[in-house]
Amino acid sequence: MEKNLYIVCGHSNAGKTNFLKEAVKLFKEKGITLGGVIAPGVWDGDEKTGIDSILFPSEELVHLAVRKPDFSEGYSRKWKFDEKLMDKINKHLGDLSNCDYVMIDEIGPLEIIKKQGFTNALKIIETAKFDNVIVAIRPSLVERLKDMAHKDYKITLIEVDKNPDINILL
C-alpha cells in the first residue's frame, strides 16, 4: 500500500486548521478512522485569544494555550502553553494505532528546529508508521519537514491559499 504524507501549508491564520476541519467532516462521512490532533483558535471577535486542541479519535477538547499579555521573543512568543497538556498531546500522538489517517495540527519551529514540543509527531513522519499522515505547517518549514520524512512517503503539498479541493486527501 502506498504511504502518503500530505503537507498542508499556509501562513498564520491562512486557513490550515479550517482545511483540516473540513477533512474531519469528510472522513466522518466516508467512515474513515482518524487519529491525531487539530488545534482550532479561540476567538474573541477578531482577536485570537487562545488555542484549543481536539484529540482524535476521542474528540476530547483541551485548552492548550492562551495569548500572553505582553509577549517576548521566541518560538512560542505569543502564547503561554500548558506544559502538562503539551505532554498529554505528545503522549496521545505516541500512543496512536489503527488509524486510516493521522492528522497533526501543527508542527512548528519548536518541533522542527528545537526538537521539543510534539516530538512524537516527528517520529510518526520519520518512521512511516501510518499509511496516511496529514501535517499542517508554515511555508518556511516545508523543506525541513520534507527532509525529515521517511523515504517511503509520497509527499503531496497542499497550499491552503490556493483553495485546494478537500478530496485531494482521498
Labelled PLM ranges:
Residues 70-113, 117-123:
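Phosphate-binding/switch loop-helix module in NTP-utilizing enzymes
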Residues 19:
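Hydrophobic positions on the alpha1 helix immediately C-terminal to the Walker A/P-loop
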Residues 12:
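The conserved Walker
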Residues 24-76:
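N-terminal phosphate/diphosphate-binding loop that engages ATP/GTP or pyrophosphate donors
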Residues 1-3:
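Phosphate-binding P-loop
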Residues 16:
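Conserved lysine of the Walker
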Residues 8:
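Hydrophobic anchor at the beta1->P-loop junction of P-loop NTPases
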